Regions:
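Phosphodiester-processing cores and adjacent nucleic acid-binding clamps
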Residues: 1-221
Length: 221
């Protein structure tokens, strides 16, 4: 099922789409317009400590953030951020540092901290030391509950960090329609990563809750 089929299945009037590049925006925009859906489009970016430091050691301090466009001008700003990450910060994949992001920031954007792969996760569950700098914006934070062993612990860490400072939103990542689709999804991910089902080496892929069915169960859609 396409993401818009899942939105129809859940009877929602808006869709929040987060992608790792801007290549899918135009198709997403046209599809949402055709279905009279409000589109909230976000670019998930890899944050590094220094955009000029392209070493193996620099990758240990990387984490993810999501930048959402509020409007048409925000879309143009997303293009600038993506271009900088692709051409100036590229090291195995697009990257950008907080200083560069700050220079490109505008009031047409919203910064979100994802639940998985964020600096909160990295600092508490890996050996990484990630130091974000939010002087130029007021980020929002996402939490999830997908029945993973660390979900509750990580949610508590997010609560500790955001206490009296930042808004927190409970979210649900959806990658497929039903729980029985999990194996097919995992197979697809393994093919993309050139791994096997016996040893997938994929973080946060030990749960079948990342689906529309689980969302429907939790929120009664």
């Amino acid at each position: 099922s396409s993401v818009f089929d899942l939105v129809k299945y859940l009877k929602l009037d808006s869709v929040t789409l987060v992608e790792d590049s801007m290549s899918g925006f135009l198709e997403a925009y046209k599809s949402s317009e055709k279905r009279n859906l409000q589109l909230q489009y976000g670019l998930r970016i890899t944050i590094c400590s220094n955009i000029e430091n392209k070493t193996t050691e620099s990758r240990a301090k990387e984490y993810k953030l999501i930048v959402f466009a509020k409007n048409t001008k925000g879309y143009s700003d997303l293009i600038k951020i993506s271009t900088t990450a692709c051409f100036e910060g590229f090291y195995y994949y697009p990257r950008i540092d907080m200083l560069s992001l700050k220079k490109l920031w505008s009031d047409n954007l919203v910064l979100a901290v994802p639940f998985y792969d964020s600096f909160v996760y990295k600092n508490n569950f890996t050996y990484s030391i990630c130091v974000p700098e939010f002087s130029f914006c007021d980020p929002i934070f996402f939490t999830e509950d997908n029945n993973l062993p660390m979900d509750r612990l990580l949610a508590n860490k997010v609560a500790d960090y955001t206490k009296d400072k930042h808004e927190v939103y409970k979210t649900q990542s959806i990658y497929y329609e039903s729980k029985e689709d999990f194996l097919s999804y995992l197979t697809f991910r393994c093919i993309s990563k050139r791994t096997t089902l016996n040893k997938p080496n994929l973080e946060h892929c030990s749960s079948n809750e990342f689906c529309a069915e689980a969302f429907k169960e939790k929120y009664g859609q």
